[in-house]
Amino acid sequence: MKFRAICENHLYQKAYSKGKRQVTNAVAVYVLPDYAAKRLARSHPERRVTNRIGLTVSTKLGSAVVRSRIRRILREGLRSLEKELSLKQGFLIVIAARGAALSMKSTEIREELRVAFRKLGMIQEP
C-alpha cells in the first residue's frame, strides 16, 4: 500500500511543535490531527480519510545509501504494522529516525513503532 506523503514543510514544523510525541531508541513519532482531511471528509463523505506520512532521516546518521536504507525499513515497518493493526485515520504522522536505528533489524524497528503508536493512542480497538 502506498502512503500519502507530507509534502509541505510547514506541516512538518506544525507536527514537531504542536503534535503529540513519543520517543523510543530507534524512532521519534510525532502525531497531529489533519484538519484538512477532516474538512474534506465533511464536504465529501464518500471519500476515505487516510493518514499522511512523513519520514525524516538526518544527515548525521550517514551517507545517502544508509539514510535511504533506514527510510525503506521505516516504510516497510509502518506498512506491515498497518496490515496487522488498525491505525486511526485522519492524522499527520512524522517518523524521525534516531541513531540506534542504524544497528537495528527491521523487526526491531517495527516493534519500536508499535510501542510508540500504542503509547500515542493511535491503535484502534476493535
Question: Over which residues does each language-model region extend?
Answer:
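Positively charged, solvent-exposed patches that mediate nucleic-acid binding
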Residues: M1-P126
